[in-house]
C-alpha cells in the first residue's frame, strides 16, 4: 500500500484482519460541512467505500450521505470551532450507535457469531 491516506487506511485494516480475520470493522466517513471542501469529503467517502469492499466484514458508516451537514449553523449549537462540543459528541455518538444498529439488523447472520470471534467456540447453526 502506498504511503497515502488511503494506503495507510488499507494497512490499518490489513493489520486488524491479520490479528483477527473475522473481526467486524466499521469505517466512518466525514460529515459534509456545507462549504468548498465538500467535494473532497465526497471523494474521501467514495474511496473509503471502495476500501470497505476490499475486506470481508468491513462496513461503511456513510456519514457523508446520511448525517446532517456540519455547517456554521449546526456548529453554533453543537461545535467548539471545528470539533464538536459535549452536546455535539453526544449527538454524534447517537448517530454512530444507531447506524451500527442498522448495519447489524440488516446483516443478522454476519453478526450472529460475534461472541465467538477470537475463540475456538463455534455455533453449529452458523458457518
Question: PLM ranges: what are they?
Answer:
Residues 3-10, 14, 90, 94-97:
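Amphipathic, non-transmembrane alpha-helical secondary structure
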Residues 12-45:
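Active-site segments of SGNH/GDSL-like serine hydrolases
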Residues 1-6, 31-33:
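Oxyanion-hole/transition-state-stabilizing segment in secreted/luminal serine hydrolases
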Residues 32-127:
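Catalytic His-Asp segment of secreted/periplasmic serine-dependent ester chemistry enzymes
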